[in-house]
């Protein structure tokens, strides 16, 4: 089997209750994959549908994000769905329903982007100006870049479907690309997106600034430290648009949306809700508490010298049960946080530490710590600073999709989580996908 080429690192769950089944019901404001984009109205509607796909339960609305935090070391399974434990114990099976949902949701998002990229430039409606054509096409390139980035860090090299299709099986027969080729496609799409997009601040839609933020993350994953520093600096230097809001909870508490903390977030409504709330909130708050912060994390985040004012990430019932409180609104209109300015500070801190710019690295790290109400880090050596950044990211992004991917990309999953089998650093390709497409190879070890 040639599967190793799909998973070599570049730098070296599904809700079974109250699931909206987004992919089975076409949103009223989206264009179906088979519908022609013929004018300004249908082009804009297709773009709204693209963001809906990105925010679906199977993607940023729940399941993809849950893989990132369940597979780390902050969360425990507390509910009725045993499928969750497969991620926590790092024994994910190929028939796991969550990975099937995530795989299909991400490819559905890619296909919506492909339709826009292929069709919008050819529309002749005079109401669809060249500027707007460029913007919509650039947004599609950005979303496709994000989607392939997420596929790459979850599964390794994947099938690169770059033209629109009318059914999920239309990509059958496309062989998997290598991890390097998959990441190259991410970069190609980001490069294509940037000149098409406006240099404005829009926290709900892609702009040049959104591209820069994802490029900073991309280059961090590639170990391209100077480029990671450069792109993160573009966002950090734009203080009129992006700031570390204080206190920490200001970006999510009191029904806050689109704060200066947010570079890119996804919105929800009373009729199109965020799936996270139901999984995190306890029955007393009309949730199911399928998972919860574990005892170690509760101790860390409530330690005034470690968590600082980030202790607002957790809360406790009158019965003494701890639960995550990042997603708390009723109805579940909480945003999904895709790119935050805090991440850019910690990306730049890590990149600078790797470049031995230790004083500058500490400045960025301490900016995040200061916002959390903490004193400056006492780390002084390169190794100590990198470890301090790793620990800061653990708390800062505890319930966002970072911890597992951070430990894998830095080769720390074995030392921190005890996951010594590197085959498990990527997930199995969903069994159903392999069964219907003989050209699709399973990841090694599954």
Where do the protein language model's features map onto the residues?
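Hydrophobic-face positions in mid-chain alpha helices that act as interaction patches
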Residues: 75, 82-84, 227-341, 382, ...
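Acidic, glycine-rich segments characteristic of secretory precursors and extracytoplasmic regions
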Residues: 3-4, 18-67, 437-446
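Aromatic-residue-lined binding/catalytic grooves and analogous aromatic/hydrophobic interfacial grooves
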Residues: 20, 157-158, 187-191, 197, ...
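Conserved, well-structured interaction surfaces
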Residues: 44, 82-155, 192-201, 331-339, ...
């Amino acid at each position: 089997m040639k599967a190793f080429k799909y998973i070599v690192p570049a730098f070296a769950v599904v809700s079974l209750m109250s699931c909206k089944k987004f992919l089975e019901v076409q949103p009223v404001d989206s264009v179906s994959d088979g519908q022609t984009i013929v004018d300004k109205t249908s082009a804009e509607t297709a773009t709204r549908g693209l963001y809906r796909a990105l925010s679906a339960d199977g993607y940023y609305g729940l399941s993809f994000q849950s893989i990132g935090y369940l597979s780390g070391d902050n969360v425990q399974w507390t509910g009725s769905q045993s499928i969750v434990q497969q991620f926590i114990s790092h024994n994910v099976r190929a028939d796991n329903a969550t990975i099937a949902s995530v795989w299909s949701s991400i490819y559905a998002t890619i296909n919506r982007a492909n339709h826009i990229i292929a069709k919008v430039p050819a529309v002749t409606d005079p109401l669809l100006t060249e500027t707007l054509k460029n913007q919509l096409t650039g947004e599609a390139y950005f979303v496709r870049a994000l989607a392939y980035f997420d596929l790459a860090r979850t599964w390794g090299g994947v099938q690169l479907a770059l033209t629109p299709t009318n059914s999920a099986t239309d990509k059958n027969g496309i062989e998997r690309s290598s991890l390097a080729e998959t990441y190259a496609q991410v970069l190609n799409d980001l490069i294509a997106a940037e000149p098409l997009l406006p240099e404005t601040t829009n926290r709900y839609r892609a702009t040049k600034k959104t591209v820069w933020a994802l490029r900073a993350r991309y280059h961090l994953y590639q170990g391209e430290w100077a480029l990671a520093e450069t792109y993160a600096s573009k966002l950090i230097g734009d203080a009129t648009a992006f700031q570390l809001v204080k206190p920490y909870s200001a970006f999510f508490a009191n029904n806050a949306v689109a704060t200066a903390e947010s570079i890119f977030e996804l919105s929800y409504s009373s009729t199109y809700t965020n799936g996270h709330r139901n999984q995190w909130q306890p029955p007393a708050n009309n949730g199911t508490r399928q998972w919860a912060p574990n005892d170690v994390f509760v101790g860390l985040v409530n330690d005034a010298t470690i968590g600082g004012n980030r202790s607002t990430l957790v809360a406790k019932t009158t019965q003494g049960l701890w639960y995550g409180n990042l997603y708390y609104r009723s109805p579940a209109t909480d945003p999904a946080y895709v790119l935050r300015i805090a991440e850019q500070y910690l990306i730049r801190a890590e990149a600078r530490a790797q470049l031995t710019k230790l004083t500058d690295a500490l400045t960025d790290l301490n900016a995040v710590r200061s916002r959390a109400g903490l004193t400056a880090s006492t780390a002084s050596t390169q190794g100590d600073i990198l470890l301090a950044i790793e620990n800061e990211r653990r708390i800062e992004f505890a319930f966002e999709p970072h911890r597992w991917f951070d430990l894998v990309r830095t080769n720390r999953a074995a030392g921190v989580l005890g996951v010594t089998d590197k085959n498990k650093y990527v997930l199995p390709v969903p069994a159903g996908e392999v069964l219907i497409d003989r050209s699709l190879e399973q990841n090694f070890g599954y």
